[in-house]
């Protein structure tokens, strides 16, 4: 697969040959969905907590005598049916993380990249550098390229000026190649890869 390379100014800078083993697969929604669910499960805090009947600070004395009241039998005021009682089967602090094999994660990333390439939502930049860290100038460059909702992936090191200028632009994320992931690829309309990012991806999956 061959794609043209553009600069931030919108000029053509040649073309790049993309590996079909990474960008030319037929996307499978089931594999992508498994990886997205794995990511969302892993990042969930799991700090929810409700007190059970054993954790309620209340007297343990029997409420009233067993017989002769005409009412139902009760032994504790901490039970869930009373106001202020403990929660029955309430949430507890736990990890929501699930397991997903590394090979499936790698395959899901390839399918997400292939999906963007197939839909025509993959853009290749020569580099992601900016002389002056000016957000207004960067917005102008992105408008010229038609990028209003995009994820930009650079090489191992982000250019400080570019990253600082992009920080305040809504619907735009900038990540180094180490941070590339299926969820962020799918949540943005366009995927922008620099030539350094493509080289790193091909080296990773070689």
Swiss-Prot record:
The yes or no answer to whether the keyword Ribonucleoprotein is present is yes
What is the gene name?
rplD
Record-level Gene Ontology MF annotations: rRNA binding; structural constituent of ribosome
One Pfam family it belongs to: Ribosomal_L4
Under the heading NCBIfam families, the entry gives: rplD_bact
What this protein is called in its record is: Large ribosomal subunit protein uL4
- Keyword terms, alphabetized: Ribonucleoprotein, Ribosomal protein, RNA-binding, rRNA-binding
The family this protein is said to belong to: Belongs to the universal ribosomal protein uL4 family.
Cited HAMAP family: Ribosomal_uL4_B
Q: Thylakoid among the record's keywords?
A: no
Q: Give GO BP annotations, semicolon-separated.
A: translation
Question: What Gene Ontology terms describe where this protein resides (cellular component)?
Answer: ribonucleoprotein complex; ribosome
Q: How does it assemble?
A: Part of the 50S ribosomal subunit.
Per the entry, what this protein does is:
One of the primary rRNA binding proteins, this protein initially binds near the 5'-end of the 23S rRNA. It is important during the early stages of 50S assembly. It makes multiple contacts with different domains of the 23S rRNA in the assembled 50S subunit and ribosome. Forms part of the polypeptide exit tunnel.
